[in-house]
């Protein structure tokens, strides 16, 4: 059994793939202990991406999907099916791994019986930012979702124990084109106990490249899809077999609501340049979703968002506009 499978979806990445692949193949971990699984989402760049991957024949495992799926969910699920490793690590095709990433995170996970190991992020270029609060306390062998701000680092660019995924049949949902990585991570967190944070290096480098339009998330989700995903996140919290105490579930839900209000999609929709009818539709979806969440969770929402949260529950656009201006 391999120690780690690195799962990487690709789509029209071309020559830029060389740098990402090299960052995986040049790890300090023994090469026979890990593998790189590349799943191509049916690139249509006249074979440029496939030609790059073919140069690594024998060094990587590769599969191309028969048709384009539109985002990373189907490729990642395909990679999960192919992996038989102890841990899986999800990597975006334009990002980079520090040479010690797999060895350090795996060893730290084994030392602490970790289900999830989160390595510190770094950024190259301007654009996408990375979570910082989660890493402020340095290395944490036994992290807490709330105390260590894990809800603010919900991308899947981490190391997950494969047995937890398999046992609980966790997979990426394909009904939405956004926040599906949040849902995967939340479902994993709600079905596992031990989380570790490693900060010795910037283990995962997010590369900002806005000359490229080939991100797998280029197909945007609708409001209906987005809030359907958010609804599933709350369901996962309230169905957790690990966090069975109802008050703890309320606390987790409240903290996720804070994250949603602080960083969620179109968080400032009420005072944005959206059309009035689009604002009404967005608020309707938001209100329906949040009103499925018990009010007992509201006391755990950060206080500055109380007015906005209540306005959303009341489906009152004017009140949301006023609350936003008071933030």
From Swiss-Prot:
It comes from Staphylococcus aureus (strain N315). Mn(2+) binds at residue 94. It is an enzyme of class 2 (transferase). Belongs to the glycosyltransferase 2 family. Keywords: Cell wall biogenesis/degradation, Glycosyltransferase, Manganese, Metal-binding, Teichoic acid biosynthesis, Transferase, Virulence. The gene is tarP. Changing residue 92 to A: Loss of activity. Its cofactor is Mn(2+). Transmembrane segments: none annotated. This is Poly(ribitol-phosphate) beta-N-acetylglucosaminyltransferase TarP.
């Amino acid at each position: 059994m391999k120690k780690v499978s690195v799962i990487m979806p690709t789509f029209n990445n071309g020559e830029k793939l060389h740098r990402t692949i090299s960052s995986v193949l040049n790890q300090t971990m023994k090469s026979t202990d890990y593998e790189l699984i590349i799943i191509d989402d049916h690139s249509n760049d006249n074979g440029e991406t496939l030609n790059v991957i073919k140069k690594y024949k024998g060094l990587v495992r590769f599969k191309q999907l028969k048709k384009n799926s539109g985002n990373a969910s189907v490729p990642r699920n395909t990679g999960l099916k192919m992996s038989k490793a102890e841990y899986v690590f999800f990597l975006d095709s334009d990002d980079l791994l520090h040479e010690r990433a797999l060895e350090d995170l795996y060893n730290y996970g084994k030392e602490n019986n970790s289900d999830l190991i989160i390595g510190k992020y770094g950024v190259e270029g301007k654009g996408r930012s990375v979570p910082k609060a989660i890493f402020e306390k340095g290395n944490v062998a036994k992290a807490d979702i709330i105390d260590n701000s894990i809800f603010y680092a919900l991308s899947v660019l981490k190391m997950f124990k494969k047995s937890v995924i398999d046992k609980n049949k966790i997979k990426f949902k394909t009904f939405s084109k956004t926040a599906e990585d949040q849902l995967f991570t939340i479902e994993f967190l709600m079905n596992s106990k031990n989380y570790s944070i490693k900060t010795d290096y910037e283990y995962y480098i997010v590369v900002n490249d806005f000359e490229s339009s080939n991100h797998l998330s280029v197909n945007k989700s609708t409001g209906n899809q987005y809030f359907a995903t958010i609804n599933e996140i709350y369901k996962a919290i309230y169905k957790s077999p690990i966090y069975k105490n109802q008050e703890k579930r309320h606390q987790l839900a409240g903290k996720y609501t804070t994250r949603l209000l602080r960083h969620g999609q179109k968080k400032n929709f009420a005072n944005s340049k959206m059309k009035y009818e689009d604002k009404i539709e967005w608020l309707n979806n938001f209100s329906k979703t949040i009103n499925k969440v018990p009010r007992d969770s509201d006391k755990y929402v950060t206080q500055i968002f109380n007015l906005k949260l209540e306005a959303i529950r009341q489906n009152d656009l004017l009140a949301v506009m006023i609350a936003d201006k008071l933030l």
